[in-house]
């Protein structure tokens, strides 16, 4: 959301926060959303998110480079958190190596719950095997190990991963580091973080987070479904549905989100469906759709194709079928062109 481009919508979203909170209260469902509070640790966010208390803008505080970001590392050192976070990272590495030891790299559980990608598993297995105390190592190798372990700690979420590594005392120290981080942020980096502010929208955060001004609770069964249904009711009551649809159509889906960071994000099929829906909404003169062989397996394939043809009635539709497909088994097309390699065969 760009509050400068659409200040009226931004103000409406901030006002809707109060309505969402009031509705949660009325339905005795406040526990389903943990609000952003500058003075409290948010248990639905990871450790890095609790320190930043906002959204990174640009590469300076991007998750992949956060553990080696000089200013953040200086804050951790000043707040006495370098050693605790290294110890947390080592504990995470040990637990993860043990839990995922017998799983192949492409196993869905590894992608969904591991704090490091499959490509880095060998590195952490080696680190755990050779190092009993990451704090004591010196030299470039030790520096590299500590950086990797701090990176694991920054991605750790106690509510989600449940290794028992963050207690109330450490939460208070992390909140203290949050305040130091914001207070001393150098001028050149002030545009690199959009902090959460109850009085304005966060242009770098999702619309959902802006409306909730918080995170949906991991530990409550059905929380996402209940909260999102409630939010939709509030949007309808406040006349914001059309504006939200416009924002959705204007948004790009990030194809690079993986692992824990992609929890709840659309998968490959959903992204294709969203792109197809966008094309249909734009009503182009000609629409070209390629259908893979495996996509013809579902029982409702012919029904889906019929819906697509109905949606494009009176306009151009080109359907590219795999070589093994038999167009004769489908309702007749106006024309069928067979292609072999790059040559029209018939």
Task: For each feature predicted by the language model, list its residue ranges.
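ABC-fold ATPase nucleotide-binding domain signature/coupling loops
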Residues: 1-50, 55-69, 83-210, 214-232, ...
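Well-ordered, non-membrane alpha-helical segments in soluble/globular domains
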Residues: 68-72, 227-231, 299-310
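Long, internal scaffold/assembly segments composed of regular secondary structure
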Residues: 71-83
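Structural motif
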Residues: 289-293, 320-324, 340
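Conserved beta-strand-loop-alpha-helix hinge in the C-terminal portion
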Residues: 328-346
């Amino acid at each position: 959301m760009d509050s400068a481009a659409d200040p009226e919508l931004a103000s409406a979203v901030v006002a809707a926060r109060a309505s969402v909170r009031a509705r949660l209260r009325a339905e005795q469902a406040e526990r389903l959303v943990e609000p952003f509070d500058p003075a409290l640790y948010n248990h639905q966010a990871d450790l890095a998110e609790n320190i930043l208390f906002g959204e990174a803008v640009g590469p300076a505080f991007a998750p992949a480079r956060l553990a080696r970001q000089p200013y953040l590392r200086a804050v951790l050192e000043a707040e006495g958190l370098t050693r605790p976070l290294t110890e947390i990272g080592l504990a995470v590495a040990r637990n993860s190596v043990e839990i995922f030891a017998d799983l192949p790299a492409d196993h869905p559980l590894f992608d969904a719950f591991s704090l490091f990608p499959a490509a880095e598993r060998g590195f952490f297995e080696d680190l755990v095997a050779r190092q009993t105390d990451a704090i004591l190592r010196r030299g470039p190798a030790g520096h590299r190990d500590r950086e990797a372990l701090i990176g694991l700690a920054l991605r750790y979420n106690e509510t989600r991963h449940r290794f028992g590594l963050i207690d109330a005392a450490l939460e208070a120290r992390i909140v203290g580091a949050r305040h130091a981080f914001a207070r001393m942020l150098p001028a050149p980096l002030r545009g690199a973080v959009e902090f959460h502010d109850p009085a304005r929208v966060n242009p770098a955060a999702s619309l959902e987070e802006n409306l909730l001004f918080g995170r949906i609770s991991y530990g409550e069964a059905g929380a996402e479904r209940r909260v999102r249904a409630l939010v939709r009711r509030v949007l309808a009551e406040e006349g914001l549905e059309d504006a939200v649809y416009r924002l959705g159509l204007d948004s790009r889906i990030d194809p690079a989100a993986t692992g824990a960071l992609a929890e709840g994000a659309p998968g490959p099929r959903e992204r294709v469906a969203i792109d197809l829906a966008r094309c249909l909404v734009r009503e182009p003169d000609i629409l070209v759709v390629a259908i893979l062989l495996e996509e013809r397996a579902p029982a409702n394939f012919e029904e889906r194709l019929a819906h697509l043809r109905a949606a494009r009635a009176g306009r151009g539709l080109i359907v590219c079928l795999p070589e093994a497909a038999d167009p004769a088994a489908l309702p007749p097309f106006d024309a069928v062109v067979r292609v072999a390699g790059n040559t029209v065969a018939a």
